[in-house]
Structures are given as structure tokens and as C-alpha cells.
């Protein structure tokens, strides 16, 4: 009874006891006993820094540290058995007035990382052939490779422009080559991976040379001497060969660096009649490397020209040649360049066709099947609009007219580049159709029925043409046809345009012509100028007022000056900011002409002055002032921003005081107005000079043109016209003066009408009025 009661009590604890026992057993089996003293004790004189040999087979207990490892810790001494403690390095601040030591860094990150350019071409020339063959080499080779240097012996009177010419001071061939190698090592030895030496009597195919050096690897070709191999002349047989200098020599940087200490010895010890043989013997004696024409599947191809025989462009040796030698004269050089360029162009077209075939053959493996390949093959697919506002618009055109004009008119004649573009597209379409249907049919264009084009930023300019054609058969039959064709003018490689350096620190002069009817707007303009320039302490901004008096107002200026409040506000502004000076000019005119007023202001300022022509409604901000400084470039560009004009308060949603809110329902960017402009005085003077020299009707044009049209028609500068979100103007009822020219009056009237409201808002307003009248 007692035994059964005891078993019933111990039965639940049985699995726990078995588990604990099994755990202890497994732990003892997995870890052997470690013979470790209680403490390290003092080291004996004969002890080594390694652990005792008797413990080599002993396993380290978990979370334990071997005594040998503790002794290996730097700075461990008598307390090596204790826990490790971090060593704190004290910070000693620099003494007051003592300049902190700056770290010396390289000028360019490529120098610090050891990044080098790929290829340098050194053209060995002379002062006699530099103006002829040297110029021809530069025109055919200079703009296609990274760096081309012309090495000549004697100094001439004047080097040809656009060429990097180095005078070595040695005319003898071997001495010239010796100094050329020294110059390359000293000036460019650490900047390039490959060096190509070639005389000016050799034509070099730039694309093939670039492909050759791009295929070679410095890891496997560290000591490479590549060219046309040739046996040494006379003497005992030599195991190596040298490279013929007439067909060019390619040297690796490592080989040149290894040759550096032996150049002087080679110059004194090696006797040779040819400079290329002298170089081959020097390289062979110093490095043991001989000339080779093949390296890891790369073959150095060359073409030896025969005098009086034309180049056979169909010859396989011609198509694969990297150099051609000898060249007789510059005309021969240009003829070779034309032939090689034609072969390179055909090779490029062939590669494009092969890539297109490969894309077509592999497109069916994609998830979408053949739909994955866009047309044309290899060009990005058309952009898919995310909303209806991003749909690209097709513009309709015919052979004579375009139905989408820059000035907003429904139809305008095709002129200039647009007309040439349409003619080129029609010619290309007809040529491609004849190529496809030849010789069964010969097609002739009758007329363009419909034409559509649009610009896709992802692809280029797309065209859809409906052509009325006449098909001619070889038997003399005729038949009218109408076909629709699609063409694409793809975008080429995107390039960064070089632009002169500009800075936000340029001094800016704001010009404000102010009529008597606009004098109430002057205080707001002056306060905006003070907020944008005077309060921040912008010393590079100035303001000049041009006060326009009518004849009657000018007669009463002594008794009742209409601009007296404006002058008082200017005086108060100068008292508030002691360093500020706001000059004004008074002009009496009945019909102010923009160009005549600008002529007067231009004469009062230096030629290097940067002008900001503003209107009384312009609200200046620091961002806009800096943008004006950055976008106006002397001798390069003039900036005409488009301000944001608020709609009529009765049409647009109501807004509070201050600048209007930038939105589609509150206003629009005024494309018709050009009241703000940023340009340099020198550019304006140059444009005015062209106007005076090119037109016999200067007086009439001075009355009919404004500054924007002056730069557009009589200046070679790039006119930048862009929206400016920092220029926000509230609505103001404007009246267009009847004294303006027809074009200026039309632009003013169009600006006033478009500034009332959007088409939707005006339509809703008319609808509400009609509903009110009907009831």
C-alpha cells in the first residue's frame, strides 16, 4: 500500500529526473577535462610565449580564455589573468591660436585611387611635316582618342591651333625617339595604361585602336611590346625581334617603367641606323621582351600601301587594319580616312542589324512573347501615360503647313528646320519602300495625305505618314497606292553641353521703368526689393528707377510732381538702409519705346553689368535673383522668365493677401508677356549694333520691337524661355496702349484675355449667366 502510494507520487517527477541526468551525461561526454592552473603565476625565465605543450590536446572550455592568449595581449603584465579593460587614449585639444594640421589630399580622387586613363598616342613628327601631315593626323585622329601629343624636334615659329605640340630639341631620329620616351615617362608615366608611338606618315584607325586597347588586360599583358615584328638587321642572329616603327608600336606602362633606368645606357651603348631597331634592342636587352604581333587572340593588323595603287576597300586586310603606311601627303591621308570611316560605318550598321536579329530571336522566350520586343528593335518602348494629363500629343502637318504652332495659331507655314525635317522624313520613307519592293515595283510619291508627329522623351521623334503613291512595274504598268508608314528618329547619345562658369555672386542691377499710371505699385516693388536684397545684406544687388513723365506732367514737375511719393519712399528706404543707394532717371516721353528706354539705361552702366529688367508687378525674391545670375551668361545666353499670373478674382477661387497660390485653378504662366529679362549690357549693345547694321528701317523697328524680340532676331545668343515659379503676380486690370506696334499690341491683348481665367472657369461662368437669364 505504501509502495504504490510512493510510486504514484514519484511517477510525475520521473521524466524530469531522467532528463536532468541525461543532460549532465551528454555534457560530460562532449567536454574533456582541462588541466588548467588556478592562476598564471609568475613567468619563468625559460618560458615561451606559446601555451604549454602538455595542453595542446586539451579542449578549451566554453567561455574560457587560454593563458597563452592572455599573454599575447599587448600590454599584458602581472594582471594578465584578469579581465581585459579598454585602453582610453586621452584627447589633447589644440592650443589656442595654433593652426590645426590639415591632411594632405590629392587634387583628384582618381589620383588617390590610382585610376589611370586608357591610351596616349604620341605622334613623332618634325617641324617640316607638322603643318601638313601633322595637321592631317590631328584632324583624323585627335578628336577620337583620349589624348594625342605631337613630339617634334626643333621649335617652329608658330604651332597649329588645336594641337598639343611638345618640342624636344633633337632632330636626329634616335635622339628624338630617346627624348620622346623620356618625356612620356616623366610627364605621363603614371597617367596612362598604354602608349602608342606612331610617325606622322602613318594613318591610324582610331576606332580599331580603341577596341584593341580596350580588349587588352594589364594583368596578362603587363610587359607587352606589340606591333609588326621584324628581324634585326645584320649581325649575329638574335632570339627576339623588333617592331617596325612605321606601322606603330604599342607599349604597356609597366614595360616603359621597367625601361626607364636603362634609357641612358641604351643611348650610349647601342648603335643602330634605325630608331625602331634601336628601341627594339633596348627593350630586349633591358627587359628580355621581344616584339610580338599577336597576344591572347588579339592580332595587330596593318596595311602596307603601295605607291600609285588605290586602296581596295573590299580587301579583308583593309577592313581589319589598325594602321596604314606610308602616307604620301595630307590628301592621301584624308582619302584613307574617308575609306576607313565608310568601312567603320558599314561595320556599325552590321552590328546593329545583328543585335536586332538577336533581340528578335530571343524575344519569344520572354513572358510576354513577341510583344516584349518594341519597334524598332533595340529602341525603348513608347512611354505609357499614368494619367490623361501625360498623354503625348500628335501634331498634324502637311507638306506646306503645320497645325500646331508655337504662337498658338491654328495653322502656320512650314519654315526652316521644320520644313527640312518633313522633307527628310518623306525622302527616307520613299527610299525605304523602294528598297523593300525592289525590283518588283518602283514607287513614286504623289502627295502626302496626312502627317502626324510627336516627341517621346524615351524614344525620339515619331512619325506616321499617309502617302499617296504610284507603283510602276517593270512591264510599264501603273497603279495608284495609298500606304501608311511609321518612322522614328531615335535620340542619339546624350551629351553634356559645355557652358561657361557662372556664379551667384555676380553683381546684379535691377531696372524698373515706371509710368505715371503705375506709380501706386512702386511702394510694393521697393519693399519687395528691400526684403530680397537689402535686408539679407546682398551687396551685389542694386536698383535703378526710370521715371517716365508725360509732356504735361513734366511741365508741372516743380509744383506738382506725380512721382513725389515714389521719391519720398526711396529716400525713406535709403535712410532705413544707410549703405543703399537707389538712383533714378527722369525721362519725358509721350509714347515710351522699350528699346529707346533701354538704350538710355545702357549708356549709364558699364558693359559688364548684369541687368534684370522688371515691371512694377514683379515681386522679387532671393531665389529669383540668384536664378537670374545663373541663367544669364555673358556672350552665351539671355534669360526671359515667364511669371505666374493670377486669374481674375471674380472667376478664380478667392485668395487671401500676399502672393497668389501656385495652382491650375488660380492662375497660369503668361507665355505672351516678356516684362522680366536677365541679360548683360555687352550682349544688349551687340544686338543693338546688329539691328542698326542689318536693317534700313531702324527707326520703325525701335518703335515696334521689345527687348525679347531684339535678342530673338538680332542676337546669336541662346534665348532661354522658361517658367519661373518664384515670380508670382496678383491680378491687375491692364490696358493695352494703342501706340504699341501691331505685334506688341496683339501679344498684350492676348495676355489680357488669357489672364481672365481658364476655359473651364469661363465656360462655367457663361453657363451660370445663361441659366440666370433664362429664369
Swiss-Prot record:
InterPro entries to which the protein is assigned, alphabetical: Chond_GalNAc, CS_glycosyltransferase
The organism's place on the tree of life at top rank: Eukaryota
Catalytic activity from the UniProt record: 3-O-(beta-D-GlcA-(1->3)-beta-D-GalNAc-(1->4)-beta-D-GlcA-(1->3)-beta-D-Gal-(1->3)-beta-D-Gal-(1->4)-beta-D-Xyl)-L-seryl-[protein] + UDP-N-acetyl-alpha-D-galactosamine = 3-O-(beta-D-GalNAc-(1->4)-beta-D-GlcA-(1->3)-beta-D-GalNAc-(1->4)-beta-D-GlcA-(1->3)-beta-D-Gal-(1->3)-beta-D-Gal-(1->4)-beta-D-Xyl)-L-seryl-[protein] + UDP + H(+); 3-O-{beta-D-GlcA-(1->3)-[beta-D-GalNAc-(1->4)-beta-D-GlcA-(1->3)](n)-beta-D-GalNAc-(1->4)-beta-D-GlcA-(1->3)-beta-D-Gal-(1->3)-beta-D-Gal-(1->4)-beta-D-Xyl}-L-seryl-[protein] + UDP-N-acetyl-alpha-D-galactosamine = 3-O-{[beta-D-GalNAc-(1->4)-beta-D-GlcA-(1->3)](n+1)-beta-D-GalNAc-(1->4)-beta-D-GlcA-(1->3)-beta-D-Gal-(1->3)-beta-D-Gal-(1->4)-beta-D-Xyl}-L-seryl-[protein] + UDP + H(+); 3-O-(beta-D-GalNAc-(1->4)-beta-D-GlcA-(1->3)-beta-D-Gal-(1->3)-beta-D-Gal-(1->4)-beta-D-Xyl)-L-seryl-[protein] + UDP-alpha-D-glucuronate = 3-O-(beta-D-GlcA-(1->3)-beta-D-GalNAc-(1->4)-beta-D-GlcA-(1->3)-beta-D-Gal-(1->3)-beta-D-Gal-(1->4)-beta-D-Xyl)-L-seryl-[protein] + UDP + H(+); 3-O-{[beta-D-GalNAc-(1->4)-beta-D-GlcA-(1->3)](n)-beta-D-GalNAc-(1->4)-beta-D-GlcA-(1->3)-beta-D-Gal-(1->3)-beta-D-Gal-(1->4)-beta-D-Xyl}-L-seryl-[protein] + UDP-alpha-D-glucuronate = 3-O-{beta-D-GlcA-(1->3)-[beta-D-GalNAc-(1->4)-beta-D-GlcA-(1->3)](n)-beta-D-GalNAc-(1->4)-beta-D-GlcA-(1->3)-beta-D-Gal-(1->3)-beta-D-Gal-(1->4)-beta-D-Xyl}-L-seryl-[protein] + UDP + H(+)
Gene Ontology process terms (BP): chondroitin sulfate proteoglycan biosynthetic process
Regions of compositional bias (Polar residues) in chain numbering: 54-66
Sugar attachment sites: 138, 361
Cytoplasmic side: 1-15
Role noted for this protein: Has both beta-1,3-glucuronic acid and beta-1,4-N-acetylgalactosamine transferase activity. Transfers glucuronic acid (GlcUA) from UDP-GlcUA and N-acetylgalactosamine (GalNAc) from UDP-GalNAc to the non-reducing end of the elongating chondroitin polymer. Seems to act as a specific activating factor for CHSY1 in chondroitin polymerization.
Protein name, as recorded: Chondroitin sulfate synthase 2
Species this protein is from: Homo sapiens
Amino acid at each position: 500500500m505504501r509502495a504504490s502510494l510512493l510510486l504514484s507520487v514519484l511517477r510525475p517527477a520521473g521524466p524530469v529526473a531522467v532528463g536532468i541526468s541525461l543532460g549532465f551525461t551528454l555534457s560530460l561526454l562532449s567536454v574533456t577535462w582541462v588541466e588548467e592552473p588556478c592562476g598564471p603565476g609568475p613567468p619563468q625565465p625559460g618560458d615561451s610565449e606559446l601555451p604549454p605543450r602538455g595542453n595542446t590536446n586539451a579542449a578549451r572550455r566554453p567561455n574560457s580564455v587560454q593563458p597563452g592568449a592572455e599573454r599575447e595581449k599587448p600590454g599584458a603584465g602581472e594582471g594578465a589573468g584578469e579581465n581585459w579593460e579598454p585602453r582610453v587614449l586621452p584627447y589633447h585639444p589644440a592650443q589656442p591660436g595654433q593652426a590645426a594640421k590639415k591632411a594632405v589630399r590629392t587634387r583628384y580622387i582618381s589620383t588617390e585611387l590610382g585610376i589611370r586613363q586608357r591610351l596616349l598616342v604620341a605622334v613623332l613628327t618634325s617641324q617640316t611635316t607638322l603643318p601638313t601631315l601633322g595637321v592631317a593626323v590631328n584632324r583624323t585622329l585627335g578628336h577620337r582618342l583620349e589624348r594625342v601629343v605631337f613630339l617634334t624636334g626643333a621649335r617652329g615659329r608658330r604651332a597649329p591651333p588645336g594641337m598639343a605640340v611638345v618640342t624636344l630639341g633633337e632632330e636626329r631620329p634616335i635622339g628624338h625617339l630617346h627624348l620622346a620616351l623620356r618625356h612620356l615617362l616623366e610627364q605621363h608615366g603614371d597617367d596612362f595604361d598604354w602608349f602608342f608611338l606612331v610617325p606622322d606618315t602613318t594613318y591610324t584607325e582610331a576606332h580599331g585602336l580603341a577596341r584593341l586597347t580596350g580588349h587588352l588586360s594589364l594583368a596578362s599583358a603587363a610587359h607587352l611590346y606589340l606591333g609588326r615584328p621584324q628581324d634585326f638587321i645584320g649581325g649575329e642572329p638574335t632570339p627576339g625581334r623588333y617592331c617596325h616603327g612605321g606601322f606603330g608600336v604599342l607599349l604597356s606602362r609597366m614595360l616603359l617603367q621597367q625601361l626607364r633606368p636603362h634609357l641612358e645606357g641604351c643611348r650610349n651603348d647601342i648603335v643602330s641606323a634605325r630608331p625602331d631597331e634601336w628601341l627594339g634592342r633596348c627593350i630586349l636587352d633591358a627587359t628580355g621582351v621581344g616584339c610580338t604581333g599577336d597576344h591572347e587572340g588579339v592580332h595587330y593588323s596593318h596595311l602596307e600601301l603601295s605607291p600609285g595603287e588605290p586602296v581596295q576597300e573590299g580587301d579583308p586586310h583593309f577592313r581589319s587594319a589598325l594602321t596604314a603606311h606610308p602616307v604620301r601627303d595630307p590628301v592621301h591621308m584624308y582619302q584613307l580616312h574617308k575609306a576607313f570611316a565608310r568601312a567603320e560605318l558599314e561595320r556599325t550598321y552590321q552590328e546593329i542589324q545583328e543585335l536586332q536579329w538577336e533581340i528578335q530571336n530571343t524575344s519569344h522566350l520572354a513572358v510576354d512573347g513577341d510583344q516584349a520586343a518594341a519597334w524598332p528593335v533595340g529602341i525603348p518602348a513608347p512611354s505609357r501615360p499614368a494619367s490623361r494629363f501625360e498623354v503625348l500629343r500628335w501634331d498634324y502637318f502637311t507638306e506646306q503647313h503645320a497645325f500646331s504652332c508655337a504662337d498658338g495659331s491654328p495653322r502656320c507655314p512650314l519654315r526652316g528646320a521644320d520644313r527640312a525635317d518633313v522633307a527628310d522624313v518623306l525622302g527616307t520613307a520613299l527610299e525605304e519602300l523602294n528598297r523593300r519592293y525592289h525590283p518588283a515595283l518602283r514607287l513614286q510619291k504623289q502627295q502626302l495625305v496626312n502627317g502626324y508627329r510627336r516627341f517621346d522623351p524615351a524614344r525620339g521623334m515619331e512619325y506616321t505618314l499617309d502617302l499617296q503613291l504610284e507603283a510602276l512595274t517593270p512591264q510599264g504598268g501603273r497603279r495608284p497606292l495609298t500606304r501608311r508608314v511609321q518612322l522614328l528618329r531615335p535620340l542619339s547619345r546624350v551629351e553634356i553641353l559645355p557652358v561657361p562658369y557662372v556664379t551667384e555672386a555676380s553683381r546684379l542691377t535691377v531696372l524698373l521703368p515706371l509710368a505715371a499710371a503705375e506709380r501706386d505699385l512702386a511702394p510694393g516693388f521697393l519693399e519687395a526689393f528691400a526684403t530680397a536684397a537689402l535686408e539679407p545684406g546682398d551687396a551685389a544687388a542694386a536698383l535703378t528707377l526710370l521715371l517716365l513723365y508725360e509732356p504735361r506732367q513734366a511741365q508741372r514737375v516743380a509744383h506738382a510732381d506725380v512721382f513725389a511719393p515714389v521719391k519720398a519712399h526711396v529716400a525713406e528706404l535709403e535712410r532705413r538702409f544707410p549703405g543703399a543707394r537707389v538712383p533714378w532717371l527722369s525721362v519725358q516721353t509721350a509714347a515710351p519705346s522699350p528699346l529707346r528706354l533701354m538704350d538710355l539705361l545702357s549708356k549709364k552702366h558699364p558693359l559688364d553689368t548684369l541687368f534684370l529688367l522688371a515691371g512694377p508687378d514683379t515681386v522679387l525674391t532671393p531665389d529669383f535673383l540668384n536664378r537670374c545670375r545663373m541663367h544669364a551668361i555673358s556672350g552665351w545666353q539671355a534669360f526671359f522668365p515667364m511669371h505666374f499670373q493670377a486669374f481674375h478674382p471674380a472667376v478664380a477661387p478667392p485668395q487671401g493677401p500676399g502672393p497668389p497660390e501656385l495652382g491650375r485653378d488660380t492662375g497660369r504662366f503668361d507665355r505672351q508677356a516678356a516684362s522680366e529679362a536677365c541679360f548683360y549690357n555687352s550682349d544688349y549693345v551687340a544686338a543693338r549694333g546688329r539691328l542698326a547694321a542689318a536693317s534700313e528701317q531702324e527707326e520703325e523697328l525701335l518703335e515696334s520691337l521689345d527687348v525679347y524680340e531684339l535678342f530673338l532676331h538680332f542676337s546669336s545668343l541662346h534665348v532661354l524661355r522658361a517658367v519661373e515659379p518664384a515670380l508670382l503676380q496678383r491680378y491687375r486690370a491692364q490696358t493695352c496702349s494703342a501706340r504699341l506696334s501691331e505685334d506688341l499690341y496683339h501679344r498684350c491683348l492676348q495676355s489680357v484675355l488669357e489672364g481672365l481665367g481658364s476655359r473651364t472657369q469661363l465656360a462655367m461662368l457663361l453657363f451660370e449667366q445663361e441659366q440666370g437669364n433664362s429664369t
